[in-house]
Amino acid sequence: MRRVTRTIAAAGAAIACCVTMTACSSPFDLPISGSVQTLAPVEQQTQRVYTNPQGPADDAQPETIVKGFYDAMPAGVQSDGYRVAREFLTGSASAGWNGDSAALVYSGTPDFRRRANTISAPQGAESSLIVEVELQVVGSLDSHGVYTPSNSTQTRRLPYTLMKKSGQWRISSLESGVVISTADFEQVFRQVSVYQVSTSGKQLIPDIRWLSWRNWRTQAVGEVLSDAPSWLEGVLRGAGLSTIKLAVDSVPVKNNVVEIHLNSGINALNEEERGLLVHRIRLTMGDGNAEYALRITGDGVDYSDADANVKLTTEQPTAGVYTLTGGHIVSLASSSPLRVGEAPGYDDARGFVFSSSGGAVLRADGVVECLKSDGASCGVMFSGEPMRSITEGLDGEVWAVSENGRELHVSDGGKETDLKLDWLGAADSIVALAVSPEGCRLALAVEGEDTNGVMMTGVARNGDKTLSGLSKAATQVSVLRHVTMLTFYNDLNLVYATTPPEGNSEQQEAWRQMAPGPANAQRLPNGIITSMASGQISLSRRLAIVDDLGIVRSVSGSLDGSWTIADSQVTALGAQ
């Protein structure tokens, strides 16, 4: 029997990464040491509320018809396949409307207003008008379930043409796609990680999608077989799956076993490729669980055990948290802070990364200085050129942002690599960055004329997991301005925060999200937060912050838990 343990992993940049293996990828404070229990595989569950919308009432006014359509759309995504929603449309409008093609996500309350239709009513219609809906759109989904945030300060107006026939109003013209409130979003869309394989062939990348609850399994298999989004192009292992399709447009569950029937295209794959495909489908359907029960066939041939010898797992290394405190390097991994090295002379350090094999410190003058495992200096990095920020990468890598914010520099075991971002606008610059636990994604805080917010791009790796390049594209995961710190809390969740203007802590914002996905506010402790990171603190996975007084606090239990002091008089705490 194969077993995979998922991990929450993210290293703090002023913190170090002490590699061990741990379980779980949920945002909860779980022990990462002690005895191991074998638990039955479980499927992701959400407290969903099922809606039961009503169809149009006789003699309803145009605004009421459009409001009723809005009330019925969530159930269409979630359960009824738009059966009730289509009752608000004319026959021709219903035939041309595809609710699954896209989604707009809005906050607040829509405003419904009618206006005259300057185009004469079609033949057979008694009259025609337009109801315009004004919304605060915060994000959107494309047909593949990829989320893109929008600037919620800008309103959007959606027109719906209605016609009156036989005394009843119906919507006769509208754009395809659904419009869903933020309150309904996670009730009707399920988060699914479509597991992609990196160019190294040794790392799995969770490609986050949001798929309708009513048929998410069918959609998920389709996405495994489809092309990856552009921001991951060039960082994934070539699959050659274009000829493989679902034999039937459904993925049933029989006797608690998911059944996936593919066409003969899978038969053309070699044994290794076929095993990898089956493994990716298993992990995607099972939320990273390699024991998820599946029956997979290709043109009648059973391939359910084709991945029996595939060793690729969703396991991630965890990060041991270290601080630079009064010239000492301190580990916070155990229940009591422990000195593990001496690094005097960095009282004004701007950043710090460390692991059991050593690390680096970003000095006050912007120069990055190498540190040995005992804290002693091992020279300067990046030819002594000043850097804006540093963070920990994969297996002891040190990533740095150039002083002008236009280039990235990476040091790995003495080898240094310079990287440019093809998608970065001419007037944009990088403020900070974080490397994902598996090392194949970058989250970057960007400010400038063309882009403001948090972007994500892919990292290509060689067979030995060393860096080989970056994707030529990026995707925006947040439009929040003035982000100066960010960290991957685990392989799915990203946490980021702003620096408040003029030291006003009440104006400091922090958010968390499955990236890309909708953002939720992250509660911070009192004071002005200057840096954040995540890793092992007091034997548990936690988010840590340091404030302007040098106090390190960590949140326990969950990201909504209480904040407790972990260390004080801290000089530097970076963010991965």
UniProtKB/Swiss-Prot annotation:
It is a lipid-anchor. Transmembrane segments: none annotated. GO terms for cellular component: plasma membrane. Residues 1-16 form the signal peptide. PROSITE patterns: PROKAR_LIPOPROTEIN. A lipid is attached at C17 (N-palmitoyl cysteine). InterPro entries: Lipoprotein_LpqB, Lipoprotein_LpqB_C. The keyword Plastid does not apply. A lipid is attached at C17 (S-diacylglycerol cysteine). Keywords: Cell membrane, Lipoprotein, Membrane, Palmitate, Signal. It is found in: Cell membrane. It comes from the Bacteria. Belongs to the LpqB lipoprotein family. This is Lipoprotein LpqB.
